[in-house]
Amino acid sequence: MGTQFRKALTLTVTNFSQKSSPINSPPFPSGGCNWYIKFYPKGSADDNYLSLFLSPDDPKSLGLNWKRRANFYFVLLNQSGKELHRTPEIGDQWFCDDSLSWGFPQTLPRKKLLDKIFLDNDRFNIEIYIKVIEVVEGYHMFPASFTNKLLRSSLEYPDKSEKETVDINGFKVLSSQVTSVKRIFEEHPDIAEDFRSKNQVVKTEYMSVLLRVIETMAKPPQSISETELSNVHSELTELTEVGFKLEWLKAKLEEVCVAFKKANADGCRIQQLEEHVKNLEQTVSDLKVEMDKEKAKSTAKVLSLEDTLSDLKTELGKEKAKNATATDKFLLLKDTYSDLKVELEKEKAKSTSAAAKVLSLKEALSDLKVELDDQKIVNSATTANVLSWEDDDDLFSHTNCLGIQQKTNAYKRIN
């Protein structure tokens, strides 16, 4: 048995957040039988956890008292190959009819995985690494069920195109099968020595199964499906159990399995690359949609800004018109101010001239007052002299008085 763990299968889970029902992986071979992964997106017992289990694919085909002792573990990865979670290793557990499944009921909290793959298109991969340590083969009773199945197939679906059969070494085969059956007996003459059934219909159907197995294994590995390979394995086991000596065909099956694994690995790689390309294309498509949305928002914003700019230009034009009117008013007031200032200067000049004239008149009046006072003094002295004179002096006095009166009248005219 193997001593090294090997990656036996990669199961891709898509739209994880929407999944609730259990998912079974395709079967894969290891340790002489097929296995499959059973994945519970919402847990086998608790909705808050993921559950992962490993089971034999068809335990009834393994016979009675079969056993497989195996170690295995699971790895969860995102689409980029980054490890999200690795389970502990389950070691030395026996799988048998009483224990058909082993695994992890609480592999990982569901919410934790959802958070990790939120930005990874809601998908991830599950890998299983297995090492079968010990195999206990089961034994089979006469496979009546398989024989009955062949009989039913023969009775329910008879070949209408060929009715003629040819006997080759006790097997009645169709004429189209003669060449192939002859070659088998030529290369392996003891192939049917231990075949136990005497029913000719059953023998014919078993030979048809053998030819179908050989035909399938003759295909190119990349054109064989996993289901076909699994069927070949089961049918080869059944043929061996009813007495066909097929060690040479088992060796050929091992070669086909190796070639199939290689082709499948290459195919998985291509599939992963195709998935990656699809993911990238989806991402580009999503980004394009997002970009179109942003472009629409940006266009709307530009239009809004253009409308605002247009409104501001209109408002600016109005303000300019108002400013032009205010400027005209200012210039008019400035001209009026200048005119008034000139008029004021003129009036000030006139006022200065009048003040000078008044001052001159005041000075003349002052002089007249002084002269009048002097005259009064003179008159007082004259009066005293007149009193001492005789009437013969009246004429002189009259003459002097007349002169004073004339001067007074002259001053009055000036005033």
UniProtKB/Swiss-Prot annotation:
Domain of life: Eukaryota
Domain MATH span(s) in chain numbering: 6-130
Entries under PROSITE patterns matching the protein: MATH
Pfam families assigned: MATH_2
Record's keyword terms, sorted: Coiled coil
InterPro entries listed in its UniProt record: MATH-CC_domain_protein, MATH/TRAF_dom, TRAF-like
Parts forming coiled coils: 244-341
Gene3D superfamilies from the UniProt entry: Apoptosis, Tumor Necrosis Factor Receptor Associated Protein 2, Chain A (2.60.210.10)
SMART domains assigned to the protein according to its UniProt record, in alphabetical order: MATH
Entry's transmembrane regions: none
UniProt name for this protein: MATH domain and coiled-coil domain-containing protein At2g42465
Organism: Arabidopsis thaliana
Organism lineage string: Eukaryota, Viridiplantae, Streptophyta, Embryophyta, Tracheophyta
